[in-house]
């Protein structure tokens, strides 16, 4: 995977050994999507794990986001949290209470998230979104209203941004 993703992309962290993984690398592919490849504990059968990095004005909000997401989706829970103050590596510039790495499940699917204070040249935008297929109007309304509450905003055609600026598409199955 690494060679193909790195081709015509930008390596953000070389593929190699780090304190948290015997094999890890971070790359931005030719389309601007970043990928973290690592050898770690198997997360069930899910090979690709969406990872949200809370940066800029959202740095320090990963916990709030996980709390929101796990409260509105069924079969959801926070699986583990590692804060910078108790973590590995030399992240002395980070706020100790912020999340270095966390795992959570939404409707049975694994997600990771983290806070980071670096001045990254990217942020959440519509280029990446989560698509949620709903069974009925009640589920659609519940997810929509929960995700736009407290600072989220509606967009067009079933799109919205949650209070953290992350994009979601809420799509009733009967429309497909």
Describe the function of each predicted region.
Residues 10, 14, 36-91, 129-130, ...:
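N-terminal beta-strand motif that seeds the catalytic metal site of vicinal oxygen chelate
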Residues 62-66, 97, 137-140:
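A structural signal for well-ordered alpha-helical scaffolds and beta->alpha junctions
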């Amino acid at each position: 995977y690494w060679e193909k993703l790195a081709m015509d992309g930008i390596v953000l962290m070389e593929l190699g050994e780090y304190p948290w993984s015997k094999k890890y690398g971070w790359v931005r592919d030719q389309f601007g999507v970043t990928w973290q490849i690592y050898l770690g504990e198997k997360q069930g059968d899910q090979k690709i794990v969406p990872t949200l990095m809370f940066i800029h004005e959202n740095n320090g909000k990963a916990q709030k986001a996980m709390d929101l997401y796990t409260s509105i989706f069924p079969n959801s829970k926070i699986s583990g949290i590692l804060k910078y103050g108790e973590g590995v590596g030399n992240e002395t510039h980070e706020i100790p209470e912020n999340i270095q790495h966390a795992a959570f499940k939404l409707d049975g699917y694994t997600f990771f998230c983290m806070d980071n204070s670096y001045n990254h040249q990217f942020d959440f935008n519509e280029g990446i979104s989560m698509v949620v297929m709903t069974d009925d109007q009640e589920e659609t309304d519940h997810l929509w209203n929960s995700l736009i509450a407290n600072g989220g905003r509606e967009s067009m055609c079933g799109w919205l941004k949650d209070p953290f600026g992350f994009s979601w598409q809420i799509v009733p199955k009967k429309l497909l």
